[in-house]
Amino acid sequence: MKNIVLILLLITSLISFHGCNNPKDENTIEFWTLQLSPVFDDYFHSLIKEYEAHNPDIKIRWIDIPYDAAIQKLLASLAAGNPPDVVNLSADFLAKFAALNALEVLTTHIPADSLRQIYLSNALEACTFRNQTVALPWYLNTYALIYNKKLITQAGFSPSDIPSTFSELTEFLREYKNRTGNYALFWNIGKDSYLPMMLGSEGIKMVNSDITRALFNSPEAVSLINSWMDLYKQGFLPSESLINTGASIIEPYQSGRVAMVFTGPVFLKRIKDNAPGIYSSTDIAPPVVGVTGKHELAAMSVALTKKSRNKKQALDFALFLTNNQNQLNFCKLATIFPSTKEAMLDPYFTSGDSTLETKARLMGARLLPKATRLRYYLQHPKFDILRDIFDESIQSIGLGNVPVKKALDLAVREWNIILGDQ
């Protein structure tokens, strides 16, 4: 079976990289990003041109790949023995490839103290696998509660009624639907579920500290998940909440079907472009939190692959990409945040006008240094399998009427088999 999988990966690699992944020499640094083209083409072309001007013997080959294809394509390139030198990975992808020993340990090239002086501690922590730094932090984001002022006012609420905690949010969802007959929020609970993030913010762990045992069938976890499943079953959440993916979270808001969306402020631009009428009534509030007050950190990183033929130059380019000025320039193109301490102190993140974009930027910059990884299990190399098992258990509760405790017990049992096989 393993041989068949390897053959399929090799075939995939030939198909995926034919014509664009020619053998590299030591003077070519191949750099992959995740779904940043064509929107940011000008930025990357300019950045690469500047780097090559200062390093005339080096050529940067930039390849942008779809986010959903990232794991498959990187696995294929590794199987073919021709991976990129520098690769953009989300924090949860790091564990998978670090566990395969595919990523360079960066502290063998640059002192850990130097990295700690440059980057935010929470961002650097997101780039750590089994106590080893396997990537450099790049751009960051966190969550915000985006809401439609017009719909909120029409329902008889004021800005002071906007929920700030998950317990307030559940009450608000009920009251809004009772008053208007419409949904207040679309939030994924059954596919790309946000429930683990909610549990983490409420101080309820999904796994133990060394990620060897699942814990989300505790009485506290069962009670909280049951409260959200009651919201779904009683009609206070749209049916799509159980079956649609995270990619669909913005559409119900920008179409005016719901009054709120809990997501990254980076999506404000999409709302502005796709639904200017909705955007004109949009405001933003801090992320909803649980009893811990903690909120989620979303981190992008850049890693070096072990098979890079020029690790020194690859690291130099990765440091250039993530330096203060280049991160600041990138952040000015979207509502994202830098991972370097110095860039975060720039006036761009501390002052500005009264526009919504500025409000989101200043709020995010103020809150982001305290953001953390609430979904600790994402550090497991089989995070995607674990995620799917949990999602399926929630779907079985909503669609199959399986009791919450039974569904979570079954999911915990499956998780423990995987977590124990390390």
Summary of predicted features, one role per range:
Residues 25-38, 58-63, 85-86, 134:
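Short, well-ordered beta-strand elements
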Residues 37-59, 390, 408:
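Short, polar/charged alpha-helical segment
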Residues 50-119, 126-128, 154-156, 252, ...:
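Extracytoplasmic "Venus flytrap"/periplasmic binding protein-like
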Residues 91-144, 170-173, 178, 197-202, ...:
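Hinge/lid segment of periplasmic solute-binding proteins
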Residues 94-102, 122-161, 188-210, 296-305, ...:
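Periplasmic solute-binding protein
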Residues 170-175, 211-242, 287:
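Glycine-centered hinge/linker elements that transmit conformational signals in sensory
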Residues 333-391, 396, 421:
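Long, aromatic- and glycine/proline-rich binding clefts that accommodate carbohydrate-like moieties
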